[in-house]
Amino acid sequence: MSVSDLRQSYEKSTLLEDSAAASPFDQFSQWFDQALAAQVPEPNAMTLATVDADGQPSARIVLIKGYDSRGFAFYTNYESRKGHDLLANPRAALLFFWQPLERQVRIEGRVEQVSAEESDAYFHSRPLGSRIGAWASRQSQPVTRAELEAREQEIRARYGEQPPRPPHWGGYRVVPTLFEFWQGRPSRLHDRLRYLPDGRGGWAIDRLSP
């Protein structure tokens, strides 16, 4: 079978205007809870797309670590490629793909750093190995495996079981300016609902052609 012959018919659900939540945050919460209930693998995994100062895009999978009406938070090394991209161009796009439910959620928005207190709280909730790793990894820089493991041992010896949060590590929050909810439907006539700010503190919903 060739790649062009790979097809799947989407028939599991619908997404209609009269049943969609008025708030995209509420709609996201409903779908996220359903992904959890369906035991979708890593439902908090999302594609994060950024663009550097020269307009070169890059994308990677990261894990969302919190969301509320302020936006969607994730944590990383500020000196990584994504960190440099966001310093030059503080805008990003997110994409959640919950394949077992035949659903996608796309989010666009501006990006801000979370507070130091939020970064500290999340950092100290992580397993020890992950906290050590945040120090050991000079993210996105070339390294050999031996160098990386030596650095890990050095950090363990220095900090023991209480490493502080590195100054180059912390959180970002994507503050949405657009949501799109996608539900697969038969014959590629998918449901796509877009939410945009209505200028009055709420959100306007429209249907997009599939």
UniProtKB/Swiss-Prot annotation:
Name of a matching Pfam family: PNPOx_N
Bound cofactor: record note? Binds 1 FMN per subunit.
Pathway listed: Cofactor metabolism; pyridoxal 5'-phosphate salvage; pyridoxal 5'-phosphate from pyridoxamine 5'-phosphate: step 1/1; Cofactor metabolism; pyridoxal 5'-phosphate salvage; pyridoxal 5'-phosphate from pyridoxine 5'-phosphate: step 1/1
> Residues that bind substrate, according to the entry?
R7, Q8, S9, Y10, K65, Y122, R126, S130, R188, L189, H190
In terms of superkingdom, the source organism counts as Bacteria
Question: What UniProt keywords apply to this chain's record, in alphabetical order?
Answer: Flavoprotein, FMN, Oxidoreductase, Pyridoxine biosynthesis
Catalytic activity entry: pyridoxamine 5'-phosphate + O2 + H2O = pyridoxal 5'-phosphate + H2O2 + NH4(+); pyridoxine 5'-phosphate + O2 = pyridoxal 5'-phosphate + H2O2
**Protein EC:** 1.4.3.5
Which co-factor is required?
A: FMN
Q: Which residues of this UniProt protein bind FMN? A: 60-65, 75-76, 81-82, 104, 139-140, 182, 192
Q: Name one GO molecular function term.
A: pyridoxamine phosphate oxidase activity
What is known about its subunit structure? Homodimer.
Check the record and name the NCBIfam families matching this protein: pdxH (TIGR00558), PRK05679.1 (NF004231)
PANTHER family for the chain: PYRIDOXINE-5'-PHOSPHATE OXIDASE (PTHR10851:SF0), PYRIDOXINE-5-PHOSPHATE OXIDASE (PTHR10851)
Q: Which family does it belong to?
A: Belongs to the pyridoxamine 5'-phosphate oxidase family.
Q: What's the stated role of this polypeptide?
A: Catalyzes the oxidation of either pyridoxine 5'-phosphate (PNP) or pyridoxamine 5'-phosphate (PMP) into pyridoxal 5'-phosphate (PLP).
From the Swiss-Prot or TrEMBL record, give the protein name. Pyridoxine/pyridoxamine 5'-phosphate oxidase
